[in-house]
UniProtKB/Swiss-Prot annotation:
The keyword Oxidoreductase applies. It comes from the Bacteria. This is Peptide methionine sulfoxide reductase MsrA. Disulfide bonds: none annotated. HAMAP family: MsrA. The active site is at C16. One of its GO terms (biological process) is protein modification process. Keywords: Oxidoreductase. It is an enzyme of class 1 (oxidoreductase). Belongs to the MsrA Met sulfoxide reductase family. It comes from Clostridium tetani (strain Massachusetts / E88). It catalyses: L-methionyl-[protein] + [thioredoxin]-disulfide + H2O = L-methionyl-(S)-S-oxide-[protein] + [thioredoxin]-dithiol; [thioredoxin]-disulfide + L-methionine + H2O = L-methionine (S)-S-oxide + [thioredoxin]-dithiol. GO terms for cellular component: cytoplasm.
Amino acid sequence: MKGVKFMKEIILAGGCFWGVEEYFSRIYGVVDTKVGYVNGVTKNPSYEEVCNGNTGYAEGCYIKFDESIIGLKRILDKFWDIIDPTILNRQGPDVGHQYRTGIYYYDKEDLDDILKSKDEISKKYDKPIVTEVEKVTYFYLAEEYHQKYLKKNPNGYCHINLDN
């Protein structure tokens, strides 16, 4: 059907959410990104609370994409390209439980594709993959100053190579 868009949503955690958001916002077919805190145990956490390590949240990037342009498999392939899925609670120089890697899905129908993708990537590493895969239970938007941070601050910190 011409003109019909097939929107899908996923949240990806890959260390500091600034770089993950900027990276995915540049991909054709991604129509929206937002950063926030995913799958913790407290209500409406602040950045400071998440950084203190007592909330259980990961820094995540909500991604809405048009599946008629880019599929979930391609989104996940790009995700694996920017993380080290064998390191627990760290990406680049960022260390802490909030910097763990994770794939958080809304649609249960996506789970098989996610697990297949994780299995495929595991064949490229000698160490086990520690990237968690969970259904989204909680997602709270991060404070406004975190949204599109690297667009507002082009020379800001980023652990991801955005020149790819």
